A protein has these predicted regions:
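Hydrophobic structural segments
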Residues: 1-134
């Protein structure tokens, strides 16, 4: 007896990834949220074009921030590192839920157990909006 395989489409989303180098912490946060908003638009549009059976969307590396270019650890943490339960993850979770997709990407992230440091974290958000892999 053969097991039925479920088929799905995956999208490797390519988009302009703005850098936040040279921006203030506040302007960096605003830039990151605008980028997430654009991602929502592109995911929705891509699903309309390539099919509703798109179930996995993979975002580019450094999609929200670029990478540090001379900033100190403290400066980059303030500018680029997001909170585990912060606005950026909430917005990404909404995209996954609204489009019924697994959303995969990476981000610089703060961890309360390691104050003053940031981590480059890969994540997967499920269609229910839950971060299922970090």
């Amino acid at each position: 007896m053969t097991k039925e395989t479920q088929h799905y489409m995956a999208l490797s989303l390519q988009l302009n990834c703005p850098t936040i180098n040279g921006l203030s912490a506040e302007d960096s946060r605003n830039s990151m949220m605008r980028t997430i908003e654009k991602i929502g638009f592109h995911v929705n549009g891509s699903k309309a074009l390539i099919g509703r059976d798109t179930k996995l969307v993979v975002l580019p590396e450094y999609f929200m921030t670029g990478y540090p270019l001379g900033e100190s650890i403290q400066e980059w943490t303030e500018k680029a590192a997001i909170e585990i339960d912060g606005a950026e993850y909430n917005a990404l979770s909404s995209i996954a839920q609204e489009n019924d997709v697994f959303l995969s990407g990476n981000a610089y992230e703060k961890d309360e157990h390691f104050p003053g440091l940031y981590f480059q974290t890969s994540f997967i958000i499920s269609p229910s909006g839950e971060v299922i892999l970090r």
